[in-house]
Amino acid sequence: MSKVKSIYNEEYLPFMIRYGRLTLSLGIIAALVPGIILSFGFGIMPPISALLASTMAIVSMSAPNYIIEPVSYSPILGIPGTYMSFLSGNISNMRLPCSIAAQKAAEVESGTEEGSIISTIGIAVSILVNISILTIGVILGGSVLSKIPA
């Protein structure tokens, strides 16, 4: 069992941390691209006072969550699951329950190496199911909307 833990700590975790940081960084960049294009590509820029006011409103409302969520969710989700969950979103309603259900089904403890791997699998499945359902909904919704008269 120590060889498995060694592989987990020396190979799996560094790999997941490296790609987790990369994908989160790319996600942040992708989230900023529309605003950058509007500002620099089309010259559409709100006044600085409006930007500062809206930023302060969002940060003051969300700041506690920036600290509380990673601290409270990470032991259950594991390091790889935390990266995946924060990138895909909807942690408390979808990712966390799927993680807990996967760990219970596999009869592993959260906070262990086994729990982290099972949690990652559960979260990955929830993301794939979520994307599948959204894709079907968008396709069906588009076909319904196209049949509605203008």
Which role fits each region the language model picked out?
Residues 1, 9-10, 77, 81, ...:
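Short, structured coil/loop segments at alpha-helix boundaries
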Residues 88-150:
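Helix-loop-helix junctions within the multi-pass membrane cores of secondary transporters/permeases
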Residues 29-32, 36, 63, 67-68, ...:
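Generic alpha-helical transmembrane segments of integral inner-membrane proteins
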